[in-house]
C-alpha cells in the first residue's frame, strides 16, 4: 500500500481525498495501530523502544506536499505524546526525521514517472536507506539511562526541507 500511495496536492484537481485518506491511514493511523498493539507488552515488561519514522517534511512543509507534510508532523507530535504517556516506565520513544533519502518514494510521488523521480536525486549525494538504518541502530543501542528523543538527518547538500544544493 505504501508504494502505491500518491502524494495529494491540494491545488491539483486530479488528486482526490482518497489519496489523502490513504496517506493518513498509512502514516498516522498505521503508527497508532502498531503502537497500540505493542505498547501493552512493553508496559508489562517495563522495557522497549519505539522508533517512529518522521521526515524533515514534517518540519519544513513544501509546495504540493501539504497532506504528506502534515502526516509527518503528526508522527513527531504523536511520538512526543507517547513519550509523555510512558514517562513512568523504562520505555524509550525516538522520532527519526530524515531528509532526502534515495528510495522509491519519489517515483510514487510523481505517479510512476521514473525520469522525474530520478531528477530529485540528480546532483546530490542523497542519504541512503542504510544510513537511516545505522541511525536506528545507534539510537536503540544506548544505555538504559539515555533516551534520544529526536534525530534529524540530512544530506550534506541539504540545509532545510527542500533547500538543496545540486552540483
Predicted regions and their residues:
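Single conserved hydrophobic/aromatic residue that forms the stacking wall/gate
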Residues: 1-6, 10
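Active-site loop immediately N-terminal to the catalytic Tyr-X3-Lys motif
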Residues: 62-66
Amino acid at each position: 500500500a505504501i508504494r502505491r500511495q500518491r502524494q495529494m496536492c491540494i491545488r491539483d484537481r486530479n488528486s482526490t481525498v482518497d489519496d489523502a485518506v490513504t496517506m493518513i491511514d498509512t502514516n498516522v493511523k498505521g503508527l497508532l495501530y502498531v503502537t497500540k498493539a505493542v505498547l501493552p507488552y512493553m508496559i508489562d515488561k517495563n522495557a522497549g523502544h519505539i522508533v517512529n519514522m518522521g521526515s524533515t517534511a514534517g518540519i519544513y512543509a513544501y509546495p504540493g506536499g501539504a497532506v504528506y507534510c502534515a502526516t509527518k508532523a503528526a508522527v513527531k507530535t504523536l511520538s512526543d505524546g507517547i513519550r509523555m504517556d510512558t514517562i513512568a516506565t523504562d520505555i524509550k520513544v525516538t522520532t527519526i526525521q530524515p531528509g532526502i533519502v534515495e528510495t522509491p518514494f519519489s517515483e510514487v510521488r510523481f505517479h510512476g514517472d521514473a525520469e522525474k523521480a530520478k531528477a530529485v536525486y540528480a546532483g546530490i549525494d542523497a542519504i541512503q536507506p542504510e544510513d537511516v538504518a545505522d541511525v536506528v541502530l545507534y539510537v536503540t543501542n544506548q544505555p538504559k539511562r539515555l533516551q534520544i528523543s529526536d534525530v534529524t538527518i540530512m544530506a550534506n547538500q541539504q540545509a532545510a526541507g527542500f533547500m538543496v544544493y545540486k552540483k
